[in-house]
Regions:
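Short amphipathic alpha-helix segments
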Residues: 10-31
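Short glycine-/aliphatic-rich beta-strand segments at the starts of folded cytosolic domains
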Residues: 1-10
Length: 237
């Protein structure tokens, strides 16, 4: 079995050696590890292979690093996600195809949309589709229906794939750190609606896409990953 070990603690000399020594003493194999230091803090992430007493292992690390250290150990697995969409199919379609071909490092448990236009597409992939209309409902009423729908699923993240509605502060707080948005610009540039139009009008030479966690500031949550593509004067928006 592969486990993921994550450690965050104050930087000091010899941490890599001391952590590796604990791992060795528990007869665990390190498949991969990464570490870096920033602003006086040490961050460590490793993939561990082997069977071992996890509670005893964590206890040994805590005794060695101190109670202020943040230590997390979990099984490596695909994350379970619920996707929110509206009417546009390209983002959702890409996720569905990658999920179908096993390229997506996640399991799509369901799709929720405020329109019914993508139902046939989603059900072709044998994934549950929930149409929760926003018509004649205020935002709180619609989000309460979404919350009720989500109760039937166990999931790690909610993924917004061109979900063209702004979530309420209460909803975001309810799932703090668990909502991921895909925004079609190289954030922090071109926040909000029509980022391609904004980029075109500014005459930029690269455009991008950003996956980020959602907070209550529009398109300003912590960035997870980004990609860019070059453009020139021949492009339009």
């Amino acid at each position: 079995m592969i486990s993921v070990l994550k450690i965050c603690t104050k930087d000091q000399k010899g941490l890599i050696y001391r952590i590796s020594d604990v791992i060795f003493k528990y007869h665990i194999n390190i498949v991969k590890n990464d570490e870096f230091v920033g602003e006086g803090m040490f961050f460590f992430r490793a993939l561990l292979e082997g069977e071992f007493d996890k509670e005893a292992f964590i206890g040994t690390l805590e005794a060695m690093l101190g109670q202020e250290a943040l230590i997390e150990l979990c099984e490596k697995r695909k994350k379970d996600i619920v996707v929110f969409a509206t009417k546009e199919s390209h983002c959702l379609g890409d996720l569905l195809i990658k999920h179908y071909s096993n390229e997506l490092e996640a399991n799509i448990k369901a799709v929720i949309s405020n329109h019914n236009s993508l139902k046939d597409l989603v059900e072709k992939f044998e994934i549950p589709y929930h149409f929760i209309s926003a018509e004649n409902l205020d935002r709180k009423e619609q989000e309460n229906q979404i919350l009720k729908c989500l109760e039937q699923y166990k999931f790690d993240y909610l993924v917004l794939a061109k979900y063209m509605r702004i979530l309420s502060p209460d909803f975001v707080r309810h799932f703090e750190g668990k909502i991921i948005n895909i925004h079609h610009s190289f954030l922090p540039a071109f926040i909000g609606a029509n980022p391609y139009k904004q980029a075109f009008e500014r005459g930029v030479k690269i455009i991008g896409a950003t996956a980020h966690f959602v907070n209550n500031n529009l398109d300003e949550g912590p960035i997870i990953t980004q990609a860019v593509s070059p453009v020139n004067h021949e492009f339009t928006w």
